[in-house]
Amino acid sequence: MNLNATILGQAISFVLFVWFCMKYIWPPIILAIETRQKEIKESLTNAKKARDELYILEKKIHQNIIDAKQKASNILNSANKQKVSILEDARNQALEESKKIILNTQSEINIAITHARKNLHKEVVDLSISMAEKIIKKNISKDDNQELLDELVTSLSQVKN
């Protein structure tokens, strides 16, 4: 066989092989490559969207945490103010109660003092009458009468004080 015929046969075989590959093998490979490229692009796009959404969610969560801390702080401040108010009210009530008790006790003491003074005055009057009876019954001298009267006046002045 001739070298030219061999080269020509190989060239024709090569062209037929290339045509066959381009017609039947190349399109599915290109289609698979393009499909894979689309999937990769979609995956990258989805990953970017997910990253952006994650960033937005992180911001929202961070803001929610800040808001929750602020609300907790407000609640604590409100509770502290309410505690102070309740304690102040309780202290004021206790002071008012103690004042009422003191006033009641003082009025009871004043009543007891007045009652004691009345009883003392009654006893002094009874004593005076008793002394006067003794003076009248004894009919003693003027000096003795004067001495008894002085004692009576002294005892009366001590009782009044």
From Swiss-Prot:
Oligomeric and partner information: F-type ATPases have 2 components, F(1) - the catalytic core - and F(0) - the membrane proton channel. F(1) has five subunits: alpha(3), beta(3), gamma(1), delta(1), epsilon(1). F(0) has three main subunits: a(1), b(2) and c(10-14). The alpha and beta chains form an alternating ring which encloses part of the gamma chain. F(1) is attached to F(0) by a central stalk formed by the gamma and epsilon chains, while a peripheral stalk is formed by the delta and b chains.
Function as written in the Swiss-Prot or TrEMBL entry: F(1)F(0) ATP synthase produces ATP from ADP in the presence of a proton or sodium gradient. F-type ATPases consist of two structural domains, F(1) containing the extramembraneous catalytic core and F(0) containing the membrane proton channel, linked together by a central stalk and a peripheral stalk. During catalysis, ATP synthesis in the catalytic domain of F(1) is coupled via a rotary mechanism of the central stalk subunits to proton translocation.
Keyword annotations from UniProtKB, A to Z: ATP synthesis, Cell membrane, CF(0), Hydrogen ion transport, Ion transport, Membrane, Transmembrane, Transmembrane helix, Transport
GO MF annotations in UniProt: proton-transporting ATP synthase activity, rotational mechanism; proton-transporting ATPase activity, rotational mechanism
Membrane as UniProt keyword: yes
Similarity section: Belongs to the ATPase B chain family.
UniProt-recorded name of the protein: ATP synthase subunit b
Record Pfam families: ATP-synt_B
Residues annotated as transmembrane: 11-31
Membrane topology, as annotated: Single-pass membrane protein
Localization in the cell: Cell membrane
InterPro entries the record matches: ATP_synth_B-like_membr_sf, ATP_synth_b/b'su_bac/chlpt, ATP_synth_F0_bsu_bac, ATP_synthase_B_chain
Source species of the chain: Buchnera aphidicola subsp. Acyrthosiphon pisum (strain APS)
GO cellular component, one term: plasma membrane
PANTHER family per UniProt: ATP SYNTHASE SUBUNIT B (PTHR33445:SF1), ATP SYNTHASE SUBUNIT B', CHLOROPLASTIC (PTHR33445)
HAMAP family named in the record: ATP_synth_b_bprime (MF_01398)
